[in-house]
From Swiss-Prot:
GO BP terms, alphabetized: gas vesicle organization
GO CC, one annotated term: gas vesicle
InterPro entries: AAA+_ATPase, ATPase_dyneun-rel_AAA, CbbQ/NirQ/NorQ/GpvN, Gas-vesicle_GvpN, P-loop_NTPase
Listed EC numbers: 3.6.4.-
Top EC category: hydrolase
Stated family: Belongs to the CbbQ/NirQ/NorQ/GpvN family.
Function: An ATPase that functions in gas vesicle formation. A minor component of the gas vesicle, also found in soluble extracts. Gas vesicles (GV) are hollow, gas filled proteinaceous nanostructures. During planktonic growth they allow positioning of the organism at a favorable depth for light or nutrient acquisition.
Protein name listed in UniProt: Gas vesicle ATPase GvpN
Pfam family, one: AAA_5
Cross-referenced NCBIfam families: gas_vesic_GvpN (TIGR02640)
Domain of life: Bacteria
Alphabetical UniProt keywords: ATP-binding, Cytoplasm, Gas vesicle, Hydrolase, Nucleotide-binding
Subcellular localization: Gas vesicle; Cytoplasm
Amino acid sequence: MTSEAASKDPISVLSGFGAGTATSASKNGGRTTPSALTPRPRSGFVETEQVRDLTRRGLGFLNAGYPLHFRGPAGTGKTTLALHVAAQLGRPVIIITGDNELGTADLVGSQRGYHYRKVVDQFIHNVTKLEETANQHWTDHRLTTACREGFTLVYDEFTRSRPETHNVLLGVFEERMLFLPAQAREECYIKVHPEFRAIFTSNPQEYAGVHASQDALADRLATIDVDYPDRAMELAVASARTGMAEASAARIIDLVRAFRASGDYQQTPTMRASLMIARVAALEGLDVSVDDPRFVQLCSDALESRIFSGQRAEAVAREQRRAALYALIETYCPSVAKPRARRAGGGARAGVEGALP
């Protein structure tokens, strides 16, 4: 499959989340509402056939009124894809990031602060009448604002929040009603805006810090599994993000993909590892070849830590795995020197060994 050119309406990335300009918080009928984001184009986003297919499938569920859920391992571009799909809806976007400390009040809203009122009445000069009142101020949080205004909610890594936090979502998706706590005073529920849509992302349950999703919520979500990008997409993204020549970027992409296929690691290398190597190599002007010891060291720094993931390993096992990694570097980033010059310099093996710490 050949790589595609950048899409006409890709989404920008803000602090790793992909969004555009933000509208400031406002007060609506005495309520404070959080800001929303408006997606805007970014040249670094690349749309391939794989992305178009996922986007089409996701929009099909959203247009029918179902909440969408992108599920897959880290590094597969779920968040960027979710924001790209949200941009196609043409509505402001509100983002929530899952967290173990997140509670229902953080989604819906709560009473914040106090409003004081003091009246001193001296209509009769020798009589003073004093009246004081103090009322709390209700603040809408992200879910309430999205439901009330018809925004698109992107709930990133939602399974990092505790399952009981999401009970409020059940009525939103089934009855299209958001039930507010008694402290809201003004209203006990709101009808969900017809244009409200929700997009969720999550990692597999075996990841650290991930909770199992409650069955009642999972049953309401339209789940699409997202796998690692195909080679065409990785190559297009690497070239667009780093400005590196396609031939050089292809070597790095193939190296990382081969390392991932080997299974000889404890932390899966993703497209982020490819971008890391390609970006640094482009900035430093390195040759994407085993001939350049600095490039070999760069690959070692970016990939070797994933083999052991901070765990202690025996010296023999460590050397064996490092040798396997260097063999992959030799295979996918071979020497570009002429044979005679390569023999004089010790060949590719000399370049590898010269990079060993």
